[in-house]
Amino acid sequence: MIHHPPAGARDLLPLEVAQKARINDQLQQTFHRWGYQRIVTSTLEWLDTLVAGGAISANNVIQLQDSGEGRLGLRPELTASIARAVVTRMTDNQPQRLCYRANVFRNPPEGYHGKQMEFFQAGIELLFAGGVRADAEILLLLTDCLTQLGLSDWQLILGDAGLTRSLLAKLPPTLQATVRDCITRLDYVELSQLPYPDNEAKNLALQLFDLRGTVEEVLARLGKLDLQGECLGLVDRLQALLCLVAASGDGPANLVLDLSWLQPFDYYTGMVFQAVSRQADNCYVLGQGGRYDQLLSQYHPQQQSFPGTGFSLNIEELHQCLLELGTLPTSTAPIDYLVCPVDDTAEGATFRHAQQLRRQHPDRRVELDLGGRSPEELNTYAQAMAVGQIVWVGADGPVDL
C-alpha cells in the first residue's frame, strides 16, 4: 500500500510540473495585466464555510475529524474561502480584483472509487462590483486568458441563473425541483411525461428545455414567452451584457446562449458560463464561473450582501487540451553547464566555479557532477541530456581536457 498514492490521488513528475507551471505562469501574467492581485487562503476550512449556507453539498467536501470546535474540510473550490477572507478583512466597498492558483479537493460521487479527488485551478474573483461592466470584464478576461494560452477553437456557453430560476418559478412549486433535475440531465422524455396540472405548465417546461442555441435564436424564443416584471428586467440586463461584450471587439468568437443550464453550485445569482473545447473525440471543460451576489452575506457578521463575480480555470483540462494541440514543451529545460572536477583535489574549486556561473547567468541551469563517472560516461550523459557545455575544473579553476 505504501508504494502507491491513495486512490484518487496522483503524483506529478517534472515534465508535467513544468508544463503546468507554464500554463499557470501565463495565466497569472494575464491576471496581473488586468489589475488582479494574488490571494492565498487556507486549504483547510470549517465545513460551514465550505458549504456556503447549503449552496455546496457537504457530500462534495472531503471532511476531516472534528477539531472540538466544529467539523473541518478540504476546500472543493476557492470562491467560498475567498469570500470569507474578503468580507471579514477587506470590506471597504471598493472593487477588489483577486486571483489565485491552488489545489482543490472533491469527494467523488458514490460508486466512483478511485476517481481523481485533487485538482488544480487558477482563477479570479471580482468582488464589491455589480453591474453589466463587471460581468463583461469577467467574460473578456476569460477570453484573453485562453487566447494567451494559444487556444482559439473553444466555445463559451452562457446562461443566467437568476433568469432561469425566475422562469422555473412560474411552474407549480411541487414540480420545480423535478423539472430542474430533468433539464440538468437533458432528459426530455421524462420532462415531457411529468404530471403537469395543465398544458400551459407543460409547454413552459418544454420551452425552458429548448432555451439553448445562438444568441439570436434564444432571444427570439424568449420573446415568445409571456415575460413580466423581474423576468423582463433580467432579459434586458442579459441583452445589455451581450451588446457590451460584442462592442468590445475582443469577446469569444463562438458563444452559445443556454438559459436551461444551471451550475452545480447553487450560489450563482446571475450570469453563469463554461468554456468548452472539443479536440478529436474529447470534450474539455476549460473553465467555469458566474455571478454570486448573495454569497458574501453568508460570512458577514451582519449578513450584509455584496456583489461578486469570477471564474476558475481547470489546469488539468487546459493541460490535456494543449497537449493535443502540441503547444507544450515535450522535455524539461536542459542543463546549460555541467561542472566537473578533474580529480578529488578540485572539489572545492568546482563548487566555487559552479556558484560563480549561477551568479553570472541567473537564468541558466548549472549542474554539478557528484563523481563516480569517467570522462567518457560524462560525455555520453551530456549528449543524452542535451547539456549545453561541460566545464572541467582543476584545483586552480577551469581547465581544457
Curated annotation (Swiss-Prot):
This function is generally fulfilled by the C-terminal part of HisG, which is missing in some bacteria such as this one. Belongs to the class-II aminoacyl-tRNA synthetase family. HisZ subfamily. The keyword Cytoplasm applies. Keywords: Amino-acid biosynthesis, Cytoplasm, Histidine biosynthesis. GO terms for molecular function: histidine-tRNA ligase activity. It is found in: Cytoplasm. InterPro entries: aa-tRNA-synth_II/BPL/LPL (IPR045864), Anticodon-bd_dom_sf (IPR036621), HisRS-like_core (IPR041715), HisRS/HisZ (IPR004516), HisZ (IPR004517). Coiled coil: none annotated. Heteromultimer composed of HisG and HisZ subunits. It comes from Synechocystis sp. (strain ATCC 27184 / PCC 6803 / Kazusa). This is ATP phosphoribosyltransferase regulatory subunit. One of its GO terms (cellular component) is cytoplasm. CDD domains: HisRS-like_core. The keyword Cytoplasm applies. Required for the first step of histidine biosynthesis. May allow the feedback regulation of ATP phosphoribosyltransferase activity by histidine. One of its GO terms (biological process) is histidyl-tRNA aminoacylation.
